[in-house]
């Protein structure tokens, strides 16, 4: 017998930064940056977070700055 596919359309992810009208991503805003970091401390990709390319680039720069300044950890505290 042939197997049937199940499922529907997946919902498009919304850019959190654009939806909340955040114009500048500050490296000191660790609460915002933690939303885009995995449990292991890795930067989440665009396909997971739904951010635009422009916002993803500025997010990456802000996260790296915060890590160097000591505001965010490089790895998880496990």
Curated annotation (Swiss-Prot):
Keywords: Ribonucleoprotein, Ribosomal protein, RNA-binding, rRNA-binding. InterPro entries: Ribosomal_bS18, Ribosomal_bS18_CS, Ribosomal_bS18_sf. One of its GO terms (molecular function) is small ribosomal subunit rRNA binding. One of its GO terms (cellular component) is cytosolic small ribosomal subunit. GO terms for biological process: translation. Belongs to the bacterial ribosomal protein bS18 family. Binds as a heterodimer with protein bS6 to the central domain of the 16S rRNA, where it helps stabilize the platform of the 30S subunit. Part of the 30S ribosomal subunit. Forms a tight heterodimer with protein bS6. This is Small ribosomal subunit protein bS18. It comes from Lactiplantibacillus plantarum (strain ATCC BAA-793 / NCIMB 8826 / WCFS1). The gene is rpsR.
């Amino acid at each position: 017998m042939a197997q049937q596919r199940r499922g529907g359309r997946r919902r498009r992810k919304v850019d959190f930064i654009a939806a909340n009208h955040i114009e500048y991503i500050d490296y000191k805003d660790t609460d915002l940056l933690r939303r885009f970091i995995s449990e292991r401390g890795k930067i989440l990709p665009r396909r997971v977070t739904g951010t635009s390319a422009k916002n993803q680039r500025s997010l990456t720069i802000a996260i790296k700055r915060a890590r160097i300044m000591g505001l965010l950890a490089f790895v998880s505290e496990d």
